[in-house]
């Protein structure tokens, strides 16, 4: 029998695939609002602009995951700095969201998130 519709464990309902971060995350109001804005952009404006991102994951996927992992303030700054780097003279290639933030990052020094998201 074909096992295409089953998840890796081989049992249960088919696994749902998504282009965004699918791990469990705390759904605080800020995170829900931030990820909703990113998802709105993905559904509406992204298809009009076209595929022009130089990174993997794309900038909108990066922003979604950064907000889901680290909250609206930290993840929003990381997503903004990623979009700024995604230009003709910017970086390119594989650039994942850090799993944990450094302890020297302070909420009142948002420009330090540039260094965090560029690694």
From Swiss-Prot:
Keywords: Cell inner membrane, Cell membrane, Membrane. It is found in: Cell inner membrane. GO terms for cellular component: plasma membrane. Pfam families: YidD. It is a peripheral membrane protein. NCBIfam families: membrane protein insertion efficiency factor YidD. Could be involved in insertion of integral membrane proteins into the membrane. Belongs to the UPF0161 family. This is Putative membrane protein insertion efficiency factor.
